Swiss-Prot record:
Organism of origin: Cupriavidus taiwanensis (strain DSM 17343 / BCRC 17206 / CCUG 44338 / CIP 107171 / LMG 19424 / R1) (Ralstonia taiwanensis (strain LMG 19424))
Family label: Belongs to the AB hydrolase superfamily. MetX family.
Site feature location: Important for acyl-CoA specificity: R335
Biological role: Transfers a succinyl group from succinyl-CoA to L-homoserine, forming succinyl-L-homoserine.
Protein name, per record: Homoserine O-succinyltransferase
Domain of life: Bacteria
Subcellular location: Cytoplasm
Keywords: Acyltransferase, Amino-acid biosynthesis, Cytoplasm, Methionine biosynthesis, Transferase
Alphabetical list of NCBIfam families matching this protein: homoserO_Ac_trn (TIGR01392), PRK00175.1 (NF001209)
UniProt-listed Gene3D superfamilies: 1.10.1740.110, alpha/beta hydrolase
Amino acid sequence: MTDVALPTAAPAAFDLPPDSVGVVAPQRMHFAEPLKLRNGSSIAGYDLMVETYGTLNADRSNAVLVCHALNASHHVAGVYADDRRNVGWWDNMVGPGKPLDTNRFFVIGINNLGSCFGSTGPMSLNPATGAPYGAAFPVVTVEDWVNAQARVADAFGITQFAAVMGGSLGGMQAVAWSLMYPDRLRHCIVIASTPKLSAQNIAFNEVARSAILSDPDFHGGNYYAHGVKPKRGLRVARMIGHITYLSDEDMAEKFGRELKSEDIRFSFDVEFQVESYLRYQGDKFAEYFDANTYLLITRALDYFDPALAHGGDLTRAMAQTQASFLVASFGTDWRFAPSRSRELVKALLDNKRPVSYAEIDAPHGHDAFLLDDPRYHNLMRAYYDRIAEEIGA
């Protein structure tokens, strides 16, 4: 690929908090060399959208890769000049003086292959046909994403990350980095994640995919040519997923059994506030997300299982890691329960690998990793202080 210029944030066009990274501008990185995929096929001439925050130091030792979860993107922090409301999905974590302090670290966010936020994916034009890939876009895996991310690191001249960090699906990518490129990261930070999906989690994903596949507007994944979008299926898929991201405690506090109107109407329309909330979330998601991308990413979640190649033995799988680990879970997260994080911790301890573990008592379920709970952020801040001291940042 062509040489990469290290971008700087665009000048602020409006007032922002002093701990914001400011107005940011993504860059499109093009890779001509084919990327061999786990399924045996290859993809060539692909693009990845990238955002960076902070300054890469002279020896390029202060870089941190932030891996995104299902519906997120490269836009980790800051705002865009033409859309102040589009705040980065982890803006409370990344910025000057924040836990991942951009005064000390150079932070990279990458939109994964197959996504719908600018990187090559099902919505992109297939050079072989001149039409969108649609259903023809190859199935990708967490491992494929990590290989693509490694090429981004190469383009920036980064031989070793100070840390690779992610929550949920992003945490799986961080684990994969520690296994596939063990000498290219000093620290691996895994938050609200799991070393593999349970049968229940795969089942949730299957129900969500079925909602999309059964939408009459899906057209076998080639709905772009029909000028439609399977919004009904996407809406239901998001509603299913959103239920799993919240805890029972959080839902009870937010909604309880509160009615949308004063009286019961004895109908199948929205009666309860929680129904209204789910429909709102589903409608919003269906407007901006792509159905084929949803299928791809949930399948990548399903396939991730580093222990599979080792007879199901996670301890054997993690033996090749060299990084120090921070693993964090949330007590009310039932999507990726603390017990799943402890499986990873045990495998690391069995291999005598350095690992710190924290289970945070937060009421917000799986989505707690996106929120700014003081205990959680203090943990992250302390760990990054340690990394900064190690590398002299």
